Amino acid sequence: MQAIQYPLAVGTGTTRIIEAGTGPTVLFSHGLGARADRWRTTVERIADRGYRAIAWDLPGHGFSTREADGPSDVPALAAHALAVMDALGVAEGVAVGTSLGAHIVAYAACSAPQRLRALGLVGALGIVPIDQAVAERISRNVRVSTREQFDGKLRFVLHDPAAVTDALIEEEWRTNTAPGTIAGFARIGEYLTTRIANDYIAAQLKVLFPPDKLLLVWGAEDKAVPLPVAYACREALGEPALAVIPAANHCPYFENPAAFDAALLPFLTHAFAGAA
């Protein structure tokens, strides 16, 4: 099913929505320095299975508004996620977030547990403590500004070098060097290295969401958020299912979609069981 995209007013700015399908709503949140179209093919595949699938650009990312005082920490980004749901008329759904996007949807779920039935957490940051070196590396990677640096950044998060095409590098460079973008990323990067510890969310998640309402998905070759973090998340959250995706680095939904969907689709069926 082909997705559509359109602008959506949220707060004082706009975001971009990528959407396909009808049915129970599944929301997809990208991570720091990425954008909604990383999820486009996933949105289309999940829509084909009977869901309304939606991805959106985080503030300051993709085609969303750049604001000098835009959201730059997880509590504010989580509030924005709930505002996106409001603007779309989505009363409840399941959220799937990757990297910092996983922290964002987890924080949103703890803020408004009646809005999110279950969570898929992919290569998740911010659930359990991360090494300072990991935070600093991510912060550096989102401040890059040349095509050569974007080439290196993409090779760091994608397992197959052939996936790093000239077209992808060019798109990444043009989108992430638009006026105001790097400054916005830098503010979030500073949060990662100095303040994220205030917002780790595992303890709250464990209280509010039983293990069968949580799914962990990790690339077997994840270099950005290494696999030991997945095991720490599983222990902290009461042993939810963990799917380790082969031949995938930090973007398993993009790198090995068949294996990713094989983990996600049964989880969605269970999450929406009994929904009106």
Name these PLM-found stretches.
Residues D48, A55-L100, F254, A262:
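Active-site loop/oxyanion-hole signature of alpha/beta-hydrolase fold enzymes
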Residues I130, R147-L208:
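Conserved alpha/beta-hydrolase catalytic His-Asp/Glu region
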Residues E221-V225:
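Acidic catalytic loop of the alpha/beta-hydrolase fold
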Residues R16-F63:
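Conserved HGGG/HGGXW glycine-rich cap/lid loop of the alpha/beta-hydrolase fold
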Residues P210, L216-W218:
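Short beta-strand/loop motif that positions the catalytic acidic residue
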Residues M1-V26, D48-Y51, V90-A91, L268-A276:
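Alpha/beta-hydrolase fold catalytic core
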Residues A106-C110, R117-E148:
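Flexible "cap/lid" loop of the alpha/beta hydrolase fold
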Residues E239-A276:
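Catalytic active-site module of serine/aspartate enzymes centered on a nucleophile-bearing elbow/loop
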